[in-house]
Amino acid sequence: FDEKIVPLMVEENRLVTEYGKLKASAKIEFDGQILNLAEIARICECQDRQKRKAASEAKYAWYESHESRFDEIYDRMVRVRTEMAHMLGYKDYVELGYYRMNRLDYNREMVAGYRKQILDYVTPLACRIYDRQKERVGYDRLEYYDLAYQFDSGNPIPKGSAEDLVEAAVNMYHEMSPETAEFIDMMKNDELWDLIARPNKEMGGYETEIPEYKSQFIFSNFNGTS
Protein backbone atom coordinates (compact mmCIF):
# COMPACT_ATOMS: atom_id res chain seq x y z
CA PHE A 1 0.00 0.00 0.00
CA ASP A 2 1.10 3.54 -0.78
CA GLU A 3 -0.83 6.70 -0.02
CA LYS A 4 -0.16 8.00 -3.52
CA ILE A 5 -2.68 5.53 -4.96
CA VAL A 6 -5.48 6.52 -2.57
CA PRO A 7 -7.19 8.78 -5.17
CA LEU A 8 -7.13 5.86 -7.63
CA MET A 9 -8.58 3.53 -4.99
CA VAL A 10 -11.37 6.05 -4.39
CA GLU A 11 -12.10 6.13 -8.13
CA GLU A 12 -11.97 2.32 -8.27
CA ASN A 13 -14.53 2.09 -5.47
CA ARG A 14 -16.73 4.65 -7.20
CA LEU A 15 -16.71 2.61 -10.41
CA VAL A 16 -17.59 -0.60 -8.53
CA THR A 17 -20.50 1.24 -6.92
CA GLU A 18 -21.60 2.67 -10.27
CA TYR A 19 -21.57 -0.83 -11.79
CA GLY A 20 -23.66 -2.23 -8.94
CA LYS A 21 -26.16 0.63 -9.17
CA LEU A 22 -26.49 0.19 -12.92
CA LYS A 23 -27.39 -3.49 -12.57
CA ALA A 24 -29.69 -2.73 -9.63
CA SER A 25 -31.54 -0.17 -11.75
CA ALA A 26 -32.74 -2.78 -14.27
CA LYS A 27 -36.44 -2.56 -15.03
CA ILE A 28 -37.38 -5.28 -17.49
CA GLU A 29 -40.94 -5.38 -18.77
CA PHE A 30 -42.07 -8.97 -19.15
CA ASP A 31 -45.49 -10.61 -19.17
CA GLY A 32 -47.19 -7.56 -17.67
CA GLN A 33 -44.63 -7.15 -14.90
CA ILE A 34 -41.63 -4.91 -14.27
CA LEU A 35 -38.80 -7.14 -13.06
CA ASN A 36 -35.20 -6.65 -12.01
CA LEU A 37 -32.37 -9.00 -12.99
CA ALA A 38 -32.78 -11.26 -9.96
CA GLU A 39 -36.52 -11.56 -10.49
CA ILE A 40 -36.37 -12.37 -14.20
CA ALA A 41 -33.69 -15.00 -13.51
CA ARG A 42 -36.44 -17.14 -11.96
CA ILE A 43 -38.43 -17.08 -15.22
CA CYS A 44 -35.28 -17.93 -17.17
CA GLU A 45 -35.38 -21.31 -15.37
CA CYS A 46 -39.12 -22.00 -15.74
CA GLN A 47 -40.53 -25.16 -17.34
CA ASP A 48 -42.03 -23.39 -20.38
CA ARG A 49 -39.27 -23.34 -23.00
CA GLN A 50 -40.71 -20.48 -25.04
CA LYS A 51 -41.17 -18.43 -21.89
CA ARG A 52 -37.56 -19.13 -20.91
CA LYS A 53 -36.44 -17.94 -24.32
CA ALA A 54 -38.54 -14.79 -24.17
CA ALA A 55 -37.37 -13.97 -20.64
CA SER A 56 -33.74 -14.52 -21.62
CA GLU A 57 -34.14 -12.31 -24.67
CA ALA A 58 -35.72 -9.58 -22.53
CA LYS A 59 -32.87 -9.80 -20.02
CA TYR A 60 -30.13 -9.57 -22.64
CA ALA A 61 -32.00 -6.80 -24.46
CA TRP A 62 -31.69 -4.76 -21.27
CA TYR A 63 -27.95 -5.43 -21.16
CA GLU A 64 -27.65 -4.46 -24.83
CA SER A 65 -29.53 -1.21 -24.26
CA HIS A 66 -26.99 -0.30 -21.56
CA GLU A 67 -23.96 -1.63 -23.42
CA SER A 68 -22.26 1.75 -23.74
CA ARG A 69 -22.45 2.41 -20.00
CA PHE A 70 -21.06 -1.03 -19.14
CA ASP A 71 -18.27 -0.53 -21.68
CA GLU A 72 -17.45 2.88 -20.25
CA ILE A 73 -17.24 1.57 -16.67
CA TYR A 74 -15.05 -1.34 -17.78
CA ASP A 75 -12.74 0.89 -19.80
CA ARG A 76 -12.33 3.35 -16.94
CA MET A 77 -11.69 0.52 -14.48
CA VAL A 78 -8.93 -0.93 -16.67
CA ARG A 79 -7.30 2.48 -16.94
CA VAL A 80 -7.51 3.16 -13.19
CA ARG A 81 -6.10 -0.22 -12.20
CA THR A 82 -3.35 -0.10 -14.81
CA GLU A 83 -2.29 3.34 -13.56
CA MET A 84 -2.39 2.03 -9.99
CA ALA A 85 -0.07 -0.84 -10.92
CA HIS A 86 2.36 1.41 -12.79
CA MET A 87 2.55 3.85 -9.87
CA LEU A 88 3.54 0.97 -7.59
CA GLY A 89 6.17 -0.32 -9.99
CA TYR A 90 4.32 -3.29 -11.52
CA LYS A 91 4.22 -4.08 -15.24
CA ASP A 92 0.43 -4.39 -15.22
CA TYR A 93 -2.47 -4.97 -12.86
CA VAL A 94 -2.33 -8.78 -12.92
CA GLU A 95 0.57 -9.12 -10.48
CA LEU A 96 -0.73 -6.34 -8.25
CA GLY A 97 -4.19 -7.92 -8.32
CA TYR A 98 -2.78 -11.20 -7.03
CA TYR A 99 -1.14 -9.41 -4.10
CA ARG A 100 -4.28 -7.41 -3.31
CA MET A 101 -6.29 -10.63 -3.10
CA ASN A 102 -3.60 -12.39 -1.03
CA ARG A 103 -2.95 -14.91 -3.80
CA LEU A 104 0.70 -15.33 -2.93
CA ASP A 105 1.16 -19.07 -3.51
CA TYR A 106 0.76 -19.04 -7.32
CA ASN A 107 1.48 -16.70 -10.23
CA ARG A 108 0.20 -15.88 -13.71
CA GLU A 109 2.26 -18.68 -15.33
CA MET A 110 0.63 -21.25 -13.03
CA VAL A 111 -2.78 -19.81 -13.85
CA ALA A 112 -2.01 -20.09 -17.57
CA GLY A 113 -1.21 -23.78 -17.01
CA TYR A 114 -4.46 -24.17 -15.11
CA ARG A 115 -6.42 -22.62 -17.99
CA LYS A 116 -4.79 -25.13 -20.35
CA GLN A 117 -5.84 -27.98 -18.05
CA ILE A 118 -9.39 -26.61 -18.01
CA LEU A 119 -9.40 -26.69 -21.81
CA ASP A 120 -7.91 -30.19 -22.00
CA TYR A 121 -9.81 -31.94 -19.20
CA VAL A 122 -12.74 -29.91 -17.85
CA THR A 123 -14.19 -28.74 -21.16
CA PRO A 124 -14.69 -32.31 -22.51
CA LEU A 125 -16.25 -33.29 -19.17
CA ALA A 126 -18.57 -30.27 -19.32
CA CYS A 127 -19.63 -31.27 -22.83
CA ARG A 128 -20.53 -34.77 -21.60
CA ILE A 129 -22.52 -33.26 -18.72
CA TYR A 130 -24.43 -31.07 -21.19
CA ASP A 131 -25.10 -34.13 -23.36
CA ARG A 132 -26.63 -35.89 -20.35
CA GLN A 133 -28.68 -32.79 -19.58
CA LYS A 134 -29.93 -32.68 -23.18
CA GLU A 135 -31.12 -36.28 -22.91
CA ARG A 136 -32.64 -35.65 -19.48
CA VAL A 137 -34.79 -32.73 -20.65
CA GLY A 138 -35.60 -34.37 -24.01
CA TYR A 139 -34.14 -31.80 -26.43
CA ASP A 140 -32.24 -32.46 -29.64
CA ARG A 141 -30.09 -29.40 -28.96
CA LEU A 142 -29.47 -27.20 -25.92
CA GLU A 143 -29.85 -23.50 -26.59
CA TYR A 144 -28.37 -20.83 -24.33
CA TYR A 145 -31.73 -20.37 -22.60
CA ASP A 146 -31.84 -24.10 -21.78
CA LEU A 147 -28.57 -24.32 -19.86
CA ALA A 148 -30.07 -23.52 -16.45
CA TYR A 149 -32.98 -25.94 -17.01
CA GLN A 150 -31.93 -29.23 -15.42
CA PHE A 151 -34.95 -31.56 -15.35
CA ASP A 152 -37.93 -32.20 -17.62
CA SER A 153 -40.17 -32.04 -14.55
CA GLY A 154 -38.83 -28.58 -13.73
CA ASN A 155 -35.97 -27.32 -11.63
CA PRO A 156 -36.09 -27.81 -7.86
CA ILE A 157 -37.54 -24.83 -6.02
CA PRO A 158 -37.45 -23.90 -2.33
CA LYS A 159 -40.18 -25.46 -0.25
CA GLY A 160 -42.14 -22.57 1.22
CA SER A 161 -41.77 -18.81 1.15
CA ALA A 162 -38.65 -16.85 2.04
CA GLU A 163 -40.11 -16.35 5.50
CA ASP A 164 -40.61 -20.12 5.84
CA LEU A 165 -36.97 -20.73 4.90
CA VAL A 166 -35.73 -18.20 7.44
CA GLU A 167 -37.89 -19.73 10.16
CA ALA A 168 -36.62 -23.21 9.31
CA ALA A 169 -33.04 -21.96 9.53
CA VAL A 170 -33.73 -20.33 12.90
CA ASN A 171 -35.22 -23.58 14.20
CA MET A 172 -32.21 -25.54 12.93
CA TYR A 173 -29.76 -23.30 14.78
CA HIS A 174 -31.88 -23.58 17.93
CA GLU A 175 -31.62 -27.36 17.71
CA MET A 176 -27.83 -27.26 17.26
CA SER A 177 -26.80 -25.57 20.51
CA PRO A 178 -27.68 -22.73 22.91
CA GLU A 179 -24.79 -20.70 21.42
CA THR A 180 -26.02 -20.94 17.84
CA ALA A 181 -29.57 -20.26 19.02
CA GLU A 182 -28.46 -17.08 20.75
CA PHE A 183 -26.46 -15.96 17.72
CA ILE A 184 -29.22 -16.53 15.14
CA ASP A 185 -31.75 -14.78 17.38
CA MET A 186 -29.41 -11.80 17.62
CA MET A 187 -29.06 -11.67 13.82
CA LYS A 188 -32.81 -11.91 13.33
CA ASN A 189 -33.73 -9.37 16.00
CA ASP A 190 -31.07 -6.89 14.86
CA GLU A 191 -32.02 -7.36 11.18
CA LEU A 192 -28.53 -8.43 10.20
CA TRP A 193 -29.65 -9.80 6.87
CA ASP A 194 -31.27 -8.53 3.69
CA LEU A 195 -32.48 -11.57 1.81
CA ILE A 196 -35.34 -11.01 -0.65
CA ALA A 197 -35.02 -9.64 -4.20
CA ARG A 198 -36.76 -6.31 -4.75
CA PRO A 199 -36.63 -3.39 -7.20
CA ASN A 200 -33.41 -1.33 -7.22
CA LYS A 201 -31.58 -3.85 -5.06
CA GLU A 202 -28.00 -4.73 -5.97
CA MET A 203 -27.45 -8.15 -7.50
CA GLY A 204 -25.64 -11.08 -5.93
CA GLY A 205 -25.16 -12.34 -2.43
CA TYR A 206 -22.47 -12.37 0.21
CA GLU A 207 -21.68 -12.68 3.89
CA THR A 208 -19.44 -10.13 5.55
CA GLU A 209 -18.23 -9.48 9.07
CA ILE A 210 -18.71 -6.44 11.30
CA PRO A 211 -15.80 -6.95 13.72
CA GLU A 212 -16.65 -4.16 16.15
CA TYR A 213 -20.06 -5.76 16.75
CA LYS A 214 -18.71 -9.35 16.61
CA SER A 215 -21.36 -10.15 14.06
CA GLN A 216 -22.00 -11.04 10.43
CA PHE A 217 -24.26 -9.48 7.85
CA ILE A 218 -25.87 -11.58 5.10
CA PHE A 219 -26.95 -10.12 1.76
CA SER A 220 -28.80 -12.14 -0.88
CA ASN A 221 -31.57 -12.08 -3.49
CA PHE A 222 -34.12 -14.82 -2.79
CA ASN A 223 -36.11 -15.17 -6.02
CA GLY A 224 -37.84 -18.54 -5.76
CA THR A 225 -35.00 -20.61 -7.24
CA SER A 226 -32.73 -23.07 -5.48
Language-model-derived ranges and their functions:
Residues 38-50, 160-225:
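Active-site-adjacent "gating/activation" loops or surface patches in catalytic cores
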Residues 1-156, 166-168:
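A well-structured
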